[in-house]
Amino acid sequence: RRTFPDGVRVVELSGVTDPGQVEQAVAHAFAGVGPGGTAAALAARVADLRALLILDTCEHLVDPVALLVPTLLAAGSRLRVLATSRQPLGIPGERIVPVPPMRVPDPDRPADPAALAGCESVALFVDRVAAAVPGFRLTRENAAAIAELCARLDGIPLAIELAAARVPALGVARLAA
């Protein structure tokens, strides 16, 4: 809270298909900037903020994001931006932090829920499913399927999140089949 006293704003860009909607999506995260807010209006709004802006899943919108972010940062603000993307934005001052694959379950060990709970890829999968399916947890019944899925997805966080998002519609066993 001390680092970002004005809060953390998360803008999920995976659902934005029109590059022209990037500014609107970011404006929505900052109260006081109405729909159709321009980059200049956004920059004015964030000029005095000590906040973190997270732009999630922006690989399909690299160009408009790469135009907007420097404008926001140049506003004299203490705004910080964290962009998640499979490719760099290519803007001055950008720091690239690769996210390596997570540890996956050992295929030669039985799928014991207690042992699997400590595996980071399994923990991510279960956490993401539980966010969409209240009460979902790692059990003896689903442990083998979850272990297999995480191993098949090579521990890649994005792949695990995308698979977990399909569980409400398909179920774990069907997804693993």
Feature names for model-found ranges:
Residues 1-177:
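Aliphatic-rich helical/repeat scaffold segments used for oligomerization and domain docking
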